[in-house]
Amino acid sequence: MAVSAVPHPSKQAQASEEGINQEKCINEEYKIWKKNSPFLYDLIITRALEWPCMSLQWYPEQQIFAEHGYTEQKMFLGVRADVGKYLLAVASIQLPYLNQTVPPTTMEGASAGDESSLRVNISNLYSHPESVCSAKLMPQDDSCVATVGNYHNDVLVFDKESFESYSSASESPLKPKYRLTKHTQPCTSVCWNFLSKGTLVSGSQDATLSCWDLNAYNESDSASVLKVHISSHEKQVSDVRFHYKHQDLLASVSYDQYLHVHDIRRPDASTKPARSVHAHSGPIHSVAFNPHNDFILATCSTDKTIALWDLRNLNQRLHTLEGHEDIVTKISFSPHEEPILASTSADRRTLVWDLSRIGEDQPAEEAQDGPPELLFMHGGHTSCTIDMDWCPNYNWTMATAAEDNILQIWTPSRSIWGNEQLEEDATAYLS
């Protein structure tokens, strides 16, 4: 019998029909979500970008225009403009001024409803020399950004001079201040140190991590910035994160299903993690430390779950969050509320979890909608969510970007999260 890579015609027809049915289902779900969104959100902004957004991050500062009833926030984006063409962009986003009495606002495209003049504008575009899968602003100096991409092995660092000297009239891309070279395969993630200015870590498909110190840069010796090169994983490193309160601690996760915690002060740091745990039954995609708690971190995986861990005892998982129907791609703790965690997935959903509700009694009819700790489900995207970020200046406000070029900024309704008990129970999940 001949073996063919081409599906049988009947199978092709079946697959085509299934695809059409799935698209219809997605469209129906979106219509239901859009109809109900005024009751679910205090704010929802939808902006169709010209290109897919591969990476997004809010700037920490804001400008307040109280007399006009809005503030202007900025967001840094990494986008794929075309085949072989990549851009970095700055978006200016107007959000309702918090001291104003602003009704729930739904915005489609670049403008809001009848009363609002709020806008989302792309204010700056910069040609990037390589692909961009992650772009991160330095916490101590947001004019400095580090980027990594799917098709090149280096970490590129751009400073204020890089952006100021850029000419949009020229066909030349941005010139990096530093090109950090060590990895032998494309990088997947990058993270700045929150306490040590100029220190960053990168993870790569070559199964290694590199920790860099830009303060040690020597023009005659480019390798001088490499602080430590870590070879502890067996497969692709998918995410890396520095601890918020300990500058020498960082975590890495990999397709080898392991979570590693590294102390870069150790003499054997280059080959052996300080802590290691087989964390999931499938490749791990993201890791996140809790910025409010020294010991809590989370991981997420292809196995559709999110795992909670305590650094003091990684031998035992604290809890498993189950609610996604596909690969969980990214997780992030709220910068404002200790027990709040958000997760994105290939199932097109962004879930918001309240860890203080773990173990609460739940009526049977509510259990059908998910566990008690599942606080909110954002269903505004019709394709896989690529990236997300909490707004640093607005509590409970997030930005999410999907494969279909849609950028959304949203705040769940206060009726959902405005629970006085939340603050009292902020650390209940640790007990």
From Swiss-Prot:
Q: Which InterPro entries match?
A: G-protein_beta_WD-40_rep, Histone-bd_RBBP4-like_N, WD40/YVTN_repeat-like_dom_sf, WD40_repeat_CS, WD40_repeat_dom_sf, WD40_rpt, WD_repeat_RBAP46/RBAP48/MSI1
Repeat in keyword set: yes
Keywords, sorted A to Z: Chromatin regulator, Nucleus, Repeat, Transcription, Transcription regulation, WD repeat
At which residues are the WD repeats? 127-159, 182-213, 232-263, 279-310, 323-354, 380-411
Which PROSITE patterns does its entry note? Answer: WD_REPEATS_1 (PS00678), WD_REPEATS_2 (PS50082), WD_REPEATS_REGION (PS50294)
Location relative to the cell: Nucleus
Give GO terms for biological process. Answer: chromatin remodeling; regulation of DNA-templated transcription; transcription initiation-coupled chromatin remodeling
| Origin superkingdom | Eukaryota
Q: Which Pfam families match?
A: CAF1C_H4-bd, WD40
Recorded GO cellular component terms are:
cytoplasm; cytosol; nucleus; Rpd3L complex; Rpd3L-Expanded complex; Rpd3S complex
Q: Predominant location of this chain?
A: nucleus
Record carries keyword Hydrolase: no
What are the GO MF terms of this UniProt record? H3-H4 histone complex chaperone activity; histone binding
Instruction: Indicate the family of this protein.
Output: Belongs to the WD repeat HIR1 family.
Function of the protein: Has a role in chromatin assembly and chromosome segregation. Involved in the deacetylation of histones.
- Listed PANTHER family: WD40 REPEAT FAMILY
* Assembly mode: Heterotetramer of alp13, clr6, prw1 and pst2.
Name of the molecule in the record: RbAp48-related WD40 repeat-containing protein prw1
Question: Which species is listed as the source?
Answer: Schizosaccharomyces pombe (strain 972 / ATCC 24843) (Fission yeast)
